[in-house]
Structures are given as C-alpha cells and as structure tokens.
Amino acid sequence: MHRKIIGFIVSFMAITATGQNLMPSGSPLYKLPYKNTYVMETLVAENAFRTMKPKKQIPESFEHAKRVLPEPYWEGHSKEIDMYWKAWQLGIKNVCQPLDESGFVSSYIAPAYNGNIFMWDDAFITMFCRYGRRYFPFQNTLNNFYSKQHPDGFICREIRADGSDCFGRYDPTSTGPNLLPWSEWLYYIQFGDDSRLNMVFPVLAAYYKWLKLNRTWRNGTYWSSGWGTGMDNMPRVPEGYNTIYSNGHMVWLDACLQQIMVANILLKMGFYLERWQEIEEFEDDIRSLSDYINRHMWSEKDGFLY
C-alpha cells in the first residue's frame, strides 16, 4: 500500500509538472503538448497574414521624406510646423524590422516604449501615418498583429519583438481596445485599397466575434479592464477591485461603444466586399447593444452616458 501511494504521488507530480512545463528537459514527458482549448473560428482560415512571408523595407532618409510628405502651411505658426516635422522625424527613427523567426511579416513603426508593439498605440499611429503613404507603407504595421491571430480569432494587445504574446488570451488585460478596424477603414476611404480591405476583413471580423464570445456578460454587454481599454489611470471599478487588472464585474461603456462602432465599420466593409452572410449578425448586435445603452446607461439628469 505504501509503495502504491508513493507511486501515485510521483505520477501526479509528473503530470502536474508537465502541465506547467516544469519537467526536466531529459524527461520523456517534457514535450507532451498541453490540451488544445481552441474553438476554431472559420474566418481565421482566410487570414493570409498568418502564412505570409516576411517583407522588410528600410525607410529612406528624412530629407527624402520632407520632399514627399504633406507640407503644412500655417502663417505665423512656425513652431507648430517645426513640431509637425519633428513628429515625422521621430516616427521614422522608430521604424523597426521584423526579427527572424518572430512571425512578424512587415517592417513596422513601434510605439517606442518597451520594444513591444501595442494594439492601442499602433492603431492611432497608423491613423496619423496614413498621410505618409507615399513615403513608407506605415499601414503594414498592423499586419504583424494580424499575423499573430490565434485560431479562435484572438489577437493580443501587446506583442514582443520576438513575436510572443505578452498575455494569455483569457487574461482580463490581454486584448483591446478594438480600434484596428477604425484605422483600416480610414485608410480605405482615403486610398480605396480594395486588395487590403479584402485581406483584413476576415481578420477583423474574427477578432470581433472573439470579443463577443469571450468579453461579454449574459445580456450581451461588454467588459474590459484598465489595461484592456488603455485607460488604466482612470479609476472606475468599485472598491476592492484592481483599477488596472480587474473588470470589476461591470458593464464597460467604452468597450460597448467601440463594438457598436466596429460593427458599423464591418457592415460597410462587408457591403463593399459583398460578404452578406458574415455581416447579418452585426446589424442585430448594433441594434441590441444600442438599445441597452440608451435604456440603462444614459442619464437624463446629467445628459451623459455612464
């Protein structure tokens, strides 16, 4: 009996350690895969970025950039114009090349924070940088997020230069805010790049569906976290919850409004691309989520949404 108990304990420790990757490298159990928990999203099968070959592009000099970038004219505001050019100069200095074996597929402009790329930062950076399209394909920065999409549609909000996610997908701080479609739509209406629109639509639709499946309460409203919204310095969760890491068991207004905005954008994209089947649910989502917000989150007294 004593021998059986010891054998059971050893076996249990081995299995537990395997799940936590704690077994020594020489152990025959070391390379056993962890259970695959992905629920596959069919739209991800259309994601061409996941199998795209990396393409590196070195930006030309800042002097060349000044000849092709939009040149502002604002009489009496020379300092502001100097700031404009300085912003471009700094941005160009922060163009990075994808590391070998990282899985990144495009040269990209980095937020210049900790060496990682951030969903929030790069969405806004590409909105600004679309005006520099004649100089450098800054929009391709977002390709690196798309190339890292998981089989269920998840995209991590922060990804290291080596291509690894900074958070597990079920971490409350792992993703968001969902602003990538906004950047892509602005790019499309300015340049009419049908080829890019066709490539990004299934990626963005799959990510939208992941959020709907994994970031909602039973009534269809959305939750997030301080890091997930990008507003970690705005305390709003009840006392006892962490401002940065917790959802506070709350309905998060900004996350709800972003999904309404994104659903509208995906509707427009789907209309142009004739993806009628995929966009049906977006109309229903807009209607039901808007109705909830107007009924429960609008203050007649303050004239404000909470």
Give residue ranges: language-model regions.
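Short helix-capping and inter-helix turn/linker motifs at the boundaries of alpha-helical repeat units
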Residues: 1, 114-118, 202
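Bacterial Sec-dependent N-terminal signal peptides
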Residues: 1-20
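Low-complexity, Ser/Thr/Pro/Gly-enriched N-terminal "stalk/linker" regions
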Residues: 20-115, 140, 292-297
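The feature captures the catalytic groove of carbohydrate-active enzymes
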Residues: 25-54, 111-112, 154-179, 212-284, ...
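Well-ordered alpha-helical scaffold segments within catalytic/enzyme domains
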Residues: 65-78, 123-136, 179-196, 257-276
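Active-site acid/base region of carbohydrate-active enzymes
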Residues: 68-93, 132, 145, 150-154, ...
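Alpha-helical support elements that line or immediately flank enzyme active sites
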Residues: 115-149
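C-terminal capping/lid segments that line or modulate ligand- or cofactor-binding pockets
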Residues: 117, 170-176, 180-190, 298-306
